[in-house]
């Protein structure tokens, strides 16, 4: 569970995007389909990566309210 997990998933998403680029059917909407596919993959990956990294390295440490504060 580290930064390398995020990089590995990025490579997987890039491979799916590259496969989707070549699999899209030819036609007048080919550009629209490719753009939609790549934007969807990018947005979903960014949402997952930011959420994962925020949980991995939180800015504010969680505190328990039932503990006594010590000096």
Curated annotation (Swiss-Prot):
<comment type="function">
    <text>Subunit of the V0 complex of vacuolar(H+)-ATPase (V-ATPase), a multisubunit enzyme composed of a peripheral complex (V1) that hydrolyzes ATP and a membrane integral complex (V0) that translocates protons. V-ATPase is responsible for acidifying and maintaining the pH of intracellular compartments.</text>
</comment>
<protein>
    <recommendedName>
        <fullName>V-type proton ATPase subunit e</fullName>
    </recommendedName>
</protein>
<dbReference type="GO" id="GO:0000220">
    <property type="term" value="C:vacuolar proton-transporting V-type ATPase, V0 domain"/>
</dbReference>
<keyword id="KW-0813">Transport</keyword>
<feature type="topological domain" description="Lumenal">
    <location>
        <begin position="57"/>
        <end position="71"/>
    </location>
</feature>
<dbReference type="InterPro" id="IPR008389">
    <property type="entry name" value="ATPase_V0-cplx_e1/e2_su"/>
</dbReference>
<keyword id="KW-0926">Vacuole</keyword>
<dbReference type="GO" id="GO:0055085">
    <property type="term" value="P:transmembrane transport"/>
</dbReference>
<dbReference type="GO" id="GO:0046961">
    <property type="term" value="F:proton-transporting ATPase activity, rotational mechanism"/>
</dbReference>
<keyword id="KW-0812">Transmembrane</keyword>
<dbReference type="GO" id="GO:0007035">
    <property type="term" value="P:vacuolar acidification"/>
</dbReference>
<keyword id="KW-0375">Hydrogen ion transport</keyword>
<feature type="topological domain" description="Cytoplasmic">
    <location>
        <begin position="24"/>
        <end position="35"/>
    </location>
</feature>
<dbReference type="Pfam" id="PF05493">
    <property type="entry name" value="ATP_synt_H"/>
</dbReference>
<feature type="topological domain" description="Lumenal">
    <location>
        <begin position="1"/>
        <end position="2"/>
    </location>
</feature>
<comment type="subunit">
    <text>V-ATPase is a heteromultimeric enzyme composed of a peripheral catalytic V1 complex (components A to H) attached to an integral membrane V0 proton pore complex (components: a, c, c', c'', d, e, f and VOA1).</text>
</comment>
<keyword id="KW-0472">Membrane</keyword>
<feature type="transmembrane region" description="Helical">
    <location>
        <begin position="36"/>
        <end position="56"/>
    </location>
</feature>
<feature type="transmembrane region" description="Helical">
    <location>
        <begin position="3"/>
        <end position="23"/>
    </location>
</feature>
<comment type="similarity">
    <text>Belongs to the V-ATPase e1/e2 subunit family.</text>
</comment>
<keyword id="KW-1133">Transmembrane helix</keyword>
<keyword id="KW-0406">Ion transport</keyword>
């Amino acid at each position: 569970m580290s930064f390398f997990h995020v990089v590995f998933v990025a490579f997987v998403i890039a491979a799916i995007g590259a496969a989707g680029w070549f699999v899209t059917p030819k036609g007048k909407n080919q550009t629209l389909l490719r753009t939609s596919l790549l934007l969807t993959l990018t947005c979903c990956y960014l949402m997952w990566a930011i959420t994962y990294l925020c949980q991995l390295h939180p800015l504010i440490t969680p505190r328990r309210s039932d503990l006594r504060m010590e000096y």
